[in-house]
Amino acid sequence: MSAAGPIAAAVGRALGRRVTAARQVAGGDINEAWAVRLDDGEVAFLKTRADAAPGEFATEAAGLAWLAEAGARVPEVLAVHDEPPRFLALAWIDGGRLDAAGEVALGSELAALPAAGAPAFGAPPPGAPAGGLRLGALELPAATALDWPAFYAEHRLLALLPHAGQDAAGQRAVEAVAERMDELAGPPEPPARLHGDLWSGNVLAGADGRARLIDPAAHGGHREVDLAMLRLFGRPAARTLAAYAEARPLADGHEERVALWQLFPLLVHAALFGGSYRGAVTEAARRAAA
């Protein structure tokens, strides 16, 4: 992209300012990411993709607003452009490291999400365009329910299983978990407001020592799911977990359910990337059912 390119021109029109420079930056597996300098000196973060679906970036923006409404720190949405070239422009966050206060604040903010709630399991953020749950290049059909075990079994595990490249043993292991969800899911929980893709790479530490949540696939779900995914690709700080537990204690048996909730993101990764994730699905299913 150049400052004279069609995306730069669209960004300028959307923001009411002229783009004077742009450089490509790291920013995800499927999108192009750019640091865009505007004529007033402000820098914006721009994510774009030639084959982005209509409403895709608008849904992400709605998710960020939904999380912010509950008290989570997120980047400010500057503009959404839902016609080609499609893009999402966010306020630039200078990177840094979480300090001790930031680790505590993150735990408290994550605990505020279930307190804010959601209308139903699977419910999208208010104002999001119609469509299913998008995770990278994968989209699950839209569905909502008030029965969490049945929802997780049908619309998460079994919906993904045909796409996850499992052998016969892996398929049987996942199906066995789905059949036992009423038993395995633990005490009933009301629908929580979830980030929906909360791995460590989507927790951005700012130069102020505080975390911002980025790249959400926000929806209503079980509150333990976000925490389980945060533990899947890294280990959240002890201060973060302690602050969460102090603000909103977890139900008995939550440690035994971590593998159960990690099964969903592992199925997503198996569907998107294959390889070792296929075996990880089988292992998680067996641990969940143990």
Q: Which residues make up each language-model segment?
A:
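Hydrophobic alpha-helical segments that form the core
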Residues: A259-L267
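ATP/Mg2+ or Mg2+-diphosphate-binding catalytic cores
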Residues: H269-A290
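Active-site Asp-x-Gly
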Residues: P141-A153, L158, P162, P190-R193, ...
